[in-house]
Amino acid sequence: TIPDALAEVREAIDFCRYYAARAREDMQPVELPGPTGERNVLRYEGRGVWAAIAPWNFPLAIFLGQVAAALVTGNTVVAKPAPQTPDIARYSIDLARKAGIPAGAIQIVAGGGDIGQVLLGDRRVVGTVFTGSVPTAKAIARNLLADDDRPLVPLIAETGGLNAMFVDSTALSEQVVRDVVISGFQSAGQRCSALRLLLLQEEIAEHTIEMLVGAMKELVVGDPANPANDIGPVIDQAAYDRLMAYRQKVADRIVFEVPVPIDGLYVPPTLVRMDSLDDLNTEWFGPIVHVATWPAGK
C-alpha cells in the first residue's frame, strides 16, 4: 500500500544515514600502543568486490542497505535484486550515481537463481550479503565452499523465522490487537519481521480473540494504490497459490478471514487457531496469523 511504500523510503534513508555514521566512527585510523616507542596505526581497507543479493519484499530499503554498507567500508558491489523487483533496484542505483557514487562502484545483474550461482561462483567476489529464505542461504553457503582452492568468502545472511508474541493477563488488550494487526497483516504479511504466532494466556484468550476479530472486520483488502485500502496483494502467482493451498489445508481451524471483494492475488488476512505448536514448522509468508493459548504459571 502507499503507507507501506512511504515507510520503506524512510527506512532506506535511515539505512544510508546509519551506515554513513558508522563509517565516520568505525573507519577512522586507530593508533595502537607502541611498547618500544614506535607509532602503530590500524587502518581498515575494503576487501574488494561484494555480491549483494536482495529480497523482493523490501526491494528498496534492504537493497540500498546492503549496497551502502559495502560501499562505506571501501568495497565495490555487484548487486542482484530479486527477479520480481529489478526496476526498483535500477532506479535506486540511478539516484545513487546522481548523488555522486562512482558509476563503476556499483553494478547490477538481473535474473533468477541461475544468475546468482554464476555471480557467487566468480572468484573475484570476496564477500556476500544475502537476505531471503533459510534454504537459499544454506545453498549459497555450500556454493561458496564448493571450490577447494578458493579462499573462504564471508557470508552475511539474514533469513526467515517464526516471529511470536507472548501475551499475558497484564497486557492491555487494545494495544495487543493493534500490534497484531499491524505486524501480522501490514504489507500482506510479507515481512521477515511479521507476526506469525500469537500466544495468549488462557485467561484472556477468548476476550482478546474477540477483539482481534472485531479489528480484522475493519480491514479493507484491495488495490494498494487506493489509500482507503489497508491490505494489498501478495507478490506473485506462486506465492498466492502456496498460501491459498495452506489455507485450504487448515480450513477447519480458521477463526476468521477478511472478505476479499475483488479478483487478483489477494490472500484474505486470516486468523488460524492452533492446537499444537508442532503443527507450525515453517514460515507462511503472507497475511496469516496463528493463535494458540498457554495456561498461567507455565
What are these regions (language model features)?
Residues 39, 47, 268-270, 288-291:
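Short glycine-rich loop/turn motifs
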Residues 1-2, 203:
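N-terminal alpha-helical segment of soluble enzymes
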Residues 95-102, 121-123, 127, 134-277, ...:
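ALDH superfamily catalytic-core signature
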Residues 1, 31-36, 226-231:
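Short linear capping/connector segments at secondary-structure termini
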Residues 10, 83-86, 206, 210, ...:
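Alpha-helix N-cap/helix-start motif at coil-to-helix transitions, marked by capping-box chemistry
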Residues 283-286:
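C-terminal lobe/hinge of AMP-binding adenylation domains
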Residues 6, 10-177:
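Rossmann-like NAD(P) dinucleotide-binding subdomain of oxidoreductase/dehydrogenase enzymes
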